């Protein structure tokens, strides 16, 4: 059995430069060559996980099957690889220090002076190797978040440097992703920041084996030659990843430039042809779609689109197979409350709406008003998580006539708590990792819209919530025409909808269908929504 291979992806110049998509693309390219691949994201922040972080600071919290609240890049990895990952695929500084300090308190270090080297770096390497050992992967790709030079990332870069020594040159491959900025005033693409970034990486003791240069537009050969010379690399080891409209074309761009071939040749001593036929078919379908549909995205974190990135991607997946291109109308629900945005105008412009997840008081009434308008106006509407809970609140107020109905999350004193805290959440006072999280079985009611989308009674979907539809009010809601189309094993409401005779498509789910959507296997809920929107558009 050949030794396990490790690919380490680092970044330079600035964060959010494209390391995550580069990692996901390489994972796909190696997987398409028949290798088993795992992808890990390292986040150097001291938080234990992303669960308590503001979406404006960090973007979406991606929930894994086992209930991990992880970085959004884990979502990219899952979508490109087409496989489920776990909480162990997202390593943070908080996890590492928590583990090392716990071991020290337990006496595991036998009186040693606990230091960054070797104790912290050993823990980092152990976490990386554990993912490979558990899965038996041929290749483990590790993306180190942040940029070279960040003080928070130094222990992780040191651990990566040690891995080259311990695992061997032929079993490790370092890729550095750095930005070559474009200056519109002079029309120049500058390579100096990339050169300085490589220099900083070398100071730490890491020589990159390939450099992926991010740029606004394709770089001239002279610029790539400069970078290759400075990095002490052949020209073929400098890859240009320029801006493209469709992220799902990126693996094809990197394949054309030979990135996976470089990695495979070094680590496995051979070159094989990938099978990208199904991926290419999806890309062609997505890019061929010309009929546009307008979808209102009603939420409270709309100023940072990464807050809802899995929902955006799930829409793309479903739309490609329907032959339409979604045009997203971002609607800040707080602006509806303030009167800055006219909900009637949103309704007239959009072909359908998604009421997005979120927590807390801000923007709630704006979401409820949007739900009312799309329900009464009979345009397709999909509510997710908090969007489902507020759909129930809206229905209770405007159909049942319970004008003061609310969720106790927003109004603990409401006389009609149609949404209330889950029984299992009572008495919990810590926020981190304590919600109802991860994949849970969902029992779908036959004869409903949801059943027509899944075609079966049992499904597994991911969750992230503390509140439920209050069972005390379920019978009254059903008598008033609301359909409960799915239940949990514990008896919680998992989905509500309206009958097709009452509304062309009104569906809201407690679970998050977006987390399991894949380019080659779109989520049924999003397929149903997009089909309804496309039908309305004509």
Swiss-Prot record:
It catalyses: UTP + L-glutamine + ATP + H2O = CTP + L-glutamate + ADP + phosphate + 2 H(+); L-glutamine + H2O = L-glutamate + NH4(+); UTP + NH4(+) + ATP = CTP + ADP + phosphate + 2 H(+). Residues 294-538 form the Glutamine amidotransferase type-1 domain. The active site is at residues 385, 512, 514. It is an enzyme of class 6 (ligase). L-glutamine binds at residues 56, 358, 386-389, 409, 466. Allosterically activated by GTP, when glutamine is the substrate; GTP has no effect on the reaction when ammonia is the substrate. The allosteric effector GTP functions by stabilizing the protein conformation that binds the tetrahedral intermediate(s) formed during glutamine hydrolysis. Inhibited by the product CTP, via allosteric rather than competitive inhibition. Pathway: Pyrimidine metabolism; CTP biosynthesis via de novo pathway; CTP from UDP: step 2/2. CTP binds at residues 15, 150-152, 190-195, 226. PROSITE patterns: GATASE_TYPE_1. The keyword Transmembrane does not apply. Mg(2+) binds at residues 73, 143. Belongs to the CTP synthase family. This is CTP synthase.
